[in-house]
């Protein structure tokens, strides 16, 4: 018989070990693929202000973020390198020093002073850069031609233009022009934030704060309340739509008009009557007897991309879903879930589609 130097591993155990290694490798691969996909998705996300800036009020802040991140990364790398070097370095023992007549190491304080000096210079440079950035975003380069008022409610945004136009959760601005935004709150503290266009500004009850935004390119920019304000804080979004001046002027003129005349169609008339009975206490439609002030103005509802403060796309089906199941979609919002018969739902939906 031949002696062995270790335990005998059966074929089945060897197979299980191989499968275990393959499974671990597969899990690691899946993890890194998922992590990479998440990183790519975040990089392209509408709220990513670290990699994207599309306006002069956001670009300096983005660059400041890069600079501070680079500074922190450099400090972390230097400290880590020094720490690893100190751990790996072998110093002679006391007995070895005595045998070789070596003196104990010392004189390390000069490194402390060097590190303190470099850190002080870096921190003061960072402070100076922060002050320069604050100055750059405090005021636009030229006086704004347009000032709008944005009022925050639980959990939606009212937008008023000087011409008398009123929208909800949707701000239109001319591209390439600074726009001053006056911010106020009707209930609690919120925060107005369009990451790719500007920084955050709080809306405080009884106080009017100001901010300015400007878009370098036409497009749709996501905005979000960034101050926790209750159960539906995460669903308190809005959009800033930047468009050429001529297109903006046409939009603004249309938004200032009252509701278009309603045809004599029986379904539309029934829908208008139902709206007056069930919705007019909170909502308003200019040009009608609906003058509610507690909820969004719906005069031009059909022209908006989203409803429910960004929770749903503005389609006929989603409008009806929102009306009938508001408390399921946004629990604790002031919008109640309204029970409707099939005929009433059809009539109300048809009426809402005319509000453009």
Model-assigned labels for residue ranges:
Residues 247-253, 318, 322-356:
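C-terminal capping alpha-helices of c-type cytochrome domains
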Residues 250, 269-280, 296-299, 317, ...:
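Solvent-exposed, polar/charged alpha-helical surfaces in well-ordered, non-transmembrane soluble domains
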Residues 158, 172-236, 242-244:
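Membrane-embedded segments
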Residues 226-235, 272-297, 304-309, 324-333, ...:
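Periplasmic/extracellular electron-transfer cofactor-ligation site
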